[in-house]
């Protein structure tokens, strides 16, 4: 009988590429895999369906906050969560109710599956994993983020609740993984157990051909994320462009938060405003294609939270896969890759616009240097930072130990 693994995503699968890669690897190895997600936004439901079409594993989505299938229950869940957050804000008392009533729906579905192993991938699914542990189901946790350290300190955020869940699940888990050596070291110091590291690299089979050499407008530079908003290094970029002649173009891909795009444009020097383009977020299936149409990738992560400082972002490894030279800020996670990347990744401080300008303009002014960096980036992805290599590290691929 096949081993049954349940991956607890608790999110839209189209926005959870690490789970997709994990499910692919496990199912290819002969494991029966089901991913348990959640519908938050109606417009992403069809994208989820497109992504899982033809997969060897099953995807089931529990109705989430804005799913019409929730009906009146959605209002009750949202009200309870709002009251729990208000209690935390006013009194400092944090509760699991802040994780949302949807966690109980996820647990009900998980219990019905009776998996041999359940793998948690988010703060909410940590709670599900803990409840499964109480019922003697084996669990694992993948810290694709350090969940309790994701946010800048907010009075109502349940960081202490999530930290307790992290400790409980990590203590009893069959195994734990995370996205960088820096994160593994930090988690190990806090909880006494060091997760294994699986970089969030991407399959070579999905890599498009790198872009041709720059044309008359100069190198095409790219910043990409799910959301376009403050605290993501864009203010650093705007200031850095003030130190450069407009010898290259910049594309920013992400869904603007409120009127942030307008505010950001006002910060760009006037000479640059026709050189900077903002594009709304793409389908996940289109991300690598748009990246590969550029020459330089901007990985301007900030160190305003421990999670942001310690993780290795998706975009950095996607840039390498697509043959882009990378300008990166010196967060602990990004330095971990940059140290091994030579000229393919150049690093500046998170508050050093002049340093960033020097990197960008240096590549724009020296095509040979840029081409060398791009070739090295592609080589690194082919030989080191690709999913074909990282997938082999997955503990779930090892035969289960006999009791």
Predicted regions and their residues:
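Glycosyltransferase donor-sugar binding loop
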Residues: 41-42, 224, 249-264
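Acidic donor-binding loop of glycosyltransferase active sites
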Residues: 174, 290-309, 324
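Membrane-proximal helix-turn-helix segments that form the acceptor-binding/catalytic region
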Residues: 22, 93, 97-112, 127, ...
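Nucleotide-activated donor-binding/catalytic signature segment of Leloir-type glycosyltransferases, i.e.
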Residues: 218, 254, 262-296
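A short, well-ordered alpha-helix in the C-terminal region of glycosyltransferases
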Residues: 355, 362, 369-384, 393
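Short hydrophobic beta-strand element within catalytic cores of glycosyltransferases
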Residues: 296-299, 318-328, 346
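Conserved acidic donor-binding segment of nucleotide-sugar-dependent glycosyltransferases
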Residues: 340-341, 345-353, 362-368
């Amino acid at each position: 009988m096949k081993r049954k693994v349940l991956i607890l995503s608790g999110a839209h699968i189209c926005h959870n590429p690490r789970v997709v890669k994990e499910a692919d690897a496990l199912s290819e190895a002969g494991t029966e895999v089901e991913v348990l997600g959640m519908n938050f936004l109606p417009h992403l439901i069809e994208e989820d369906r497109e992504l899982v079409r033809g997969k060897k594993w099953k995807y089931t989505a529990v109705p989430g906050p804005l799913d019409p299938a929730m009906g009146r229950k959605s209002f009750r869940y949202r009200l309870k969560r709002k009251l729990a957050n208000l209690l935390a804000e006013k009194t400092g008392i944090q509760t699991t109710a802040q994780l949302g009533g949807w966690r109980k729906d996820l647990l009900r579905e998980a219990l019905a599956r009776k998996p041999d192993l359940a793998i948690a991938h988010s703060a909410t699914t940590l709670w599900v994993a803990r409840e499964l542990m109480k019922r003697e189901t084996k669990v694992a946790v993948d810290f694709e983020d350090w969940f309790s350290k994701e946010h800048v300190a907010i009075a109502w955020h349940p960081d202490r609740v999530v930290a307790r869940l992290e400790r409980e699940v990590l203590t009893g888990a069959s195994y734990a993984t995370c996205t960088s050596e820096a994160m593994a070291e930090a988690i190990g110091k806090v909880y006494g157990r060091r997760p294994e590291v699986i970089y969030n690299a991407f399959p070579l089979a999905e890599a498009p051909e790198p872009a041709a050499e720059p044309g008359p407008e100069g190198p095409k530079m790219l910043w990409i994320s799910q959301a376009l908003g403050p605290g993501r290094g864009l203010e650093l970029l705007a200031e850095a462009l003030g130190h450069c002649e407009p010898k290259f173009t910049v594309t920013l891909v992400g869904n603007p938060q409120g009127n942030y795009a307008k505010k950001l444009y006002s910060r760009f020097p006037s000479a640059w405003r026709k050189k900077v383009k903002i594009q709304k977020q793409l389908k996940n299936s289109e991300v690598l294609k748009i990246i590969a149409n550029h020459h330089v990738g901007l990985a301007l992560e900030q160190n305003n939270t421990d999670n942001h400082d310690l993780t290795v972002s998706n975009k950095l490894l996607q840039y390498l896969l697509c043959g882009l030279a990378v300008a990166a800020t010196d967060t602990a996670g990004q330095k971990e890759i940059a140290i091994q990347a030579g000229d393919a990744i150049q690093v500046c401080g998170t508050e050093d616009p002049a340093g960033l300008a020097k990197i960008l303009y240096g590549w724009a002014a020296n095509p040979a240097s840029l081409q060398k960096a791009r070739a090295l980036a592609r080589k690194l992805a082919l030989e080191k930072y690709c999913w074909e290599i990282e997938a082999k590290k997955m503990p779930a691929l090892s035969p289960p130990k006999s009791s």
